[in-house]
Amino acid sequence: MRSDSSRRDLLGPGLLLAALALLLWRCTLTFCWSDEGFYLALAHRFWLGDLPFVDEWNTAQLYAPFLLPFYALWRAITGGTTGIYLAARVAAVLLQFALAFALYRALRPRGRGTALAASLLVLVYAKAGIGGLSYYTLCYLFFGTGLLLFYFACETASTARMGLCFAAGAVMALAVVCMPYLAVLWVLPVVFLLLPSAHGRRGPVLAFLGGTGAAALVYLAWLLHRVSLSALLEHLPFVLMDPDGSSTSLPVLALKALVQPFYQFRFGLLFWGGALAASLLLPRLRQVNSVSALPAKVRRLLLSAALAGFAVNLLTSGDMLGKAHLALCLLAVQGWLLTPPARRPVREALCFFLPGWAFGLVWQVGSNTGFSGMTLGFALACAGAAPMVGACLHCLSEEGTLARRTGRALAALVLCVPVLLSGWQRLALEYRDAPLSQCTQRLTIGPAAGLATTPEHAAQYAAICQALTGSENDGPVFVTALAPWAYLCTDRPMGASTSWRTYLDSELLEVYYRQHPERFPSTVLVLDEAVGGYTSTLQPEENPLPNQNSGREDGFLTLELARRGYTPHTTPVGTVYEAG
């Protein structure tokens, strides 16, 4: 018979596998028309032979080469794109599980509960609940893997440490491709090399920078193999004309990044903010070295205030996936202050917590998705936050400030509740479709085969597939905004500057067709406004016009189609214009 210890050793992996099973089941539910389709359409476009920067004018294309191996493998296996939506979702979940499981093994010496909570919080997170191989997910995976490699490097022999640091630099360079603003973080290792105190300790940093340089060279070699440097520079200004780019100034974005955590949890600020302020001021007033040197009664009061703020923060987290992660991170700061300096989990704080916050701040500045972009960093920071909270409660119990049972109960509560809340948000809420109870129709054809959506969306989806596959034209095709997935229904060239939400009145289209007259579409599908519109999402405030499909009827493309004598045909989902 297995001992109790052996059974407990199996509990963590068992719960991780159970969470994996639930996430794989969730992969089959809901159909997001725009975002996931856009990522796959980028890979589709490059697989067909289109050139980066020259033919595609969206900044998100930088990460598309990472999707090409997956896309090519799926086509080799299936002979087409049928079911690729579901395959991408499954691939993303499996990659995230691999990171979470490795994290569990790494943090296991800190305690089973701490390791399990940290790994589950990393596993169940998805930015805004978006499925598939988005640049959010890959950036999260690349950066998280790099942090984990650093964590391993901290306690390995010098030879292995150099290799781990090199690998960390390489994989984190890939995160920069997904979010270029992350490059600012590389200032830190460069500054470290210039410090006199760094003498004799520069090897790991140089290995890290070497890995970054090696990955950058491989990426640039691929890019310049596909497109010449002169062509890239010629078309770069058009790519930077991206209408979805943020127009907010950099100082304002940086200020918002610093204020966001306080604003998001303003209702509990009196509790958690007051506890943090008191923890910083009281040691100075009492002339002691740290909060841990204050009387037990004072420390209990500070912990109680922080826990009250934590509870309010969880209760006000609403439907936003990642807010519970931030709540735990804020509690972890308080836990750090209450823990004696010699007992603090410094390695976890340096390898996960602080880089996670930096990662989130960069996403706030570099993305137009607001606070939800920041939550990417908070999810990774939880790999350090969970050990910080666990260490605090363990120390308070050991020294008698808390009863042992109370400390264990609090540790279980504060680590389990964010996991359960985040898990519910990931499984039960949807991103740009309809509530799960309405997603009763299973798609059986095309790129989204295997997904369940509403009967209305299923009918619209089938009609779009039919409209494109039934066309006898073999020239470029253009589909209005909300159905970038439709490009995956055919191997015809893409007749648009980008597959991302292109409207009939897009200013870029006229410029694009002047640059690429051969890309003027032979088939144009103008979707009705009601087609593809979602009724439920986690963050509806991010896009004020998320369901707009075509744009103004007097836009450039509409007038040009009429001038060229294109023949319109009415379909159940909109109008198809065909070249004569």
Give, region by region, the residue ranges found by the protein language model.
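Short hydrophobic/aromatic helix or loop-helix immediately within or flanking a transmembrane segment
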Residues: 40-44, 55-80, 175
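Short periplasmic/luminal acceptor-recognition loop of GT-C membrane glycosyltransferases, typified by
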Residues: 58, 421-504, 522-536, 572-578
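Transmembrane-helix signature of polytopic, membrane-embedded enzymes
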Residues: 98-124
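Membrane-interface transmembrane helices that cradle and orient dolichyl/undecaprenyl
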Residues: 109, 113, 144-167, 199, ...
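Membrane-interface alpha helices of multi-pass inner-membrane proteins
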Residues: 127, 149, 162-180, 186-191, ...
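Short acidic/glycine- and proline-prone juxtamembrane loop motifs at membrane-interface regions
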Residues: 131-140
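Short hydrophobic alpha-helices at membrane interfaces in multi-pass membrane enzymes
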Residues: 149-174, 200-210, 300-303, 348-356
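Perimembrane helix-loop-helix junctions
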Residues: 155, 184-224, 285-288, 398
